């Protein structure tokens, strides 16, 4: 069964780093959303597939998403052809809707290089479809883009990933480090009072924290640590205004002493994913230190390289697990 992942970044440079990092990509395509965003779809393959004869479905082994998030595998209902008995399912297109997505069968067809004997076509088993979307800067733009992608997708997603670069909290997250969120926190969604900051929970207006499935967070972090660079699991703060002073950095660190990184989109992505019942994880590559704004000290190129490496690791491990 193909794992389907939606990766949401803020800007095109981040989306390109994610796409460039994906390994084993057999086909790429693009589709336009009504919101004006473009989703690029990458089908990752493992090798030549052998299609088994149709049989009545039985309990399936857990998919990667189920294994990582603790979801129980389901017993699929038989198709009309399977219910009709032997011979009825000989035509593989009999039960497929006319507009079915090519990746829905779990197979992708690619054309092999031309040889002396002419071009050959080989069927490759699709292990994952990774859709990448640059949704815009800030939690509102990210939420709109993610919700639109989820609503208009030709297939249901198993996982949503908020990914990009961000600021790191010293000394936990040095430049170039990867941070995997064990909590996605809307750090400025609340109210300032003479007695201090109040979260929306304390105000009675909703939530400011999303907690990714712990098993998923741990598996992603393990895969990223295999890249050899620094990687930590910690809360990632979502803010609408990037921190640019020592005083604000100190205030955030005091309220969130375990914080690893600051970015602007994670909570918006998580809100949209939660509305559709899809698990979410956030990954940030550190480009600068949270604190006084000093563009000369930023290392955006190195952070994008780390992001590229992160998705190289994920596309060869977590996205391919059975």
Stretches found by the model and what they are:
Residues 290-322:
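His/Asp/Glu-rich mid-to-C-terminal helical/loop segments that flank catalytic regions of hydrolases
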Residues 1-52, 56, 117-211:
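Metabolite-binding pocket within alpha/beta catalytic cores that recognizes anionic/polar moieties
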Residues 21, 25, 215-230, 272, ...:
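Generic non-transmembrane alpha-helical segments
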Residues 196-257, 268, 276:
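Active-site rim beta-loop-alpha module in soluble metabolic enzymes
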Residues 247, 252-263, 267-301:
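Active-site-adjacent mobile loop/cap segments within catalytic or ligand-binding domains
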Residues 156, 174, 232, 258, ...:
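Short loop/turn motifs at secondary-structure junctions
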Residues 40, 45, 49-59, 63-64, ...:
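Threonine-centered tandem repeat motifs in low-complexity domains
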Residues 133, 161, 179, 232-237, ...:
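Hydrophobic/aromatic beta-strand patches that form the interior of the parallel beta-sheet core
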């Amino acid at each position: 069964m193909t794992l389907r992942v939606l990766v949401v970044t803020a800007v095109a440079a981040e989306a390109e780093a994610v796409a460039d990092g994906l390994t084993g990509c057999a086909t790429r395509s693009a589709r336009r959303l009504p919101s004006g965003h473009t989703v690029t779809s990458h089908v990752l393959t493992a090798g030549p597939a052998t299609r088994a004869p149709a049989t009545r479905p039985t309990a399936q082994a857990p998919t990667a998403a189920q294994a990582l998030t603790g979801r129980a595998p389901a017993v699929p209902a038989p198709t009309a052809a399977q219910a009709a008995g032997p011979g009825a399912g000989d035509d593989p297109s009999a039960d497929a809707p006319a507009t079915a997505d090519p990746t829905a069968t779990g197979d992708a067809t690619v054309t092999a290089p031309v040889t002396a004997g002419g071009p050959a076509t080989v069927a490759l088993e699709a292990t994952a479809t990774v859709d990448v979307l640059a949704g815009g800067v800030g939690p509102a733009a990210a939420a709109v883009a993610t919700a639109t992608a989820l609503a208009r997708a030709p297939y249901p997603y198993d996982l949503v990933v908020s990914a990009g670069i961000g600021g790191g909290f010293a000394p936990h997250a040095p430049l170039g480090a990867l941070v995997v969120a064990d909590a996605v926190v809307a750090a400025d969604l609340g109210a300032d009072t003479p007695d201090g900051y109040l979260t929306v929970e304390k105000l009675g207006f909703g939530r400011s924290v999303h907690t990714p499935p712990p098993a998923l967070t741990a598996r992603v972090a393990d895969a990223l640590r295999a890249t050899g660079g620094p990687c930590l699991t910690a809360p990632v703060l979502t803010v609408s205004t990037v921190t640019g002073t020592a005083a604000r950095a100190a205030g955030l660190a005091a309220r969130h002493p375990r914080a690893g990184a600051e970015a602007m989109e994670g909570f918006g992505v998580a809100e949209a994913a939660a509305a559709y019942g899809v698990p979410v994880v956030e990954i940030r590559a550190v480009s600068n230190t949270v604190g006084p704004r000093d563009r000369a000290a930023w290392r955006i190129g190195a952070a994008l390289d780390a992001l590229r490496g992160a998705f190289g690791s994920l596309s060869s491990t977590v996205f391919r697990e059975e």
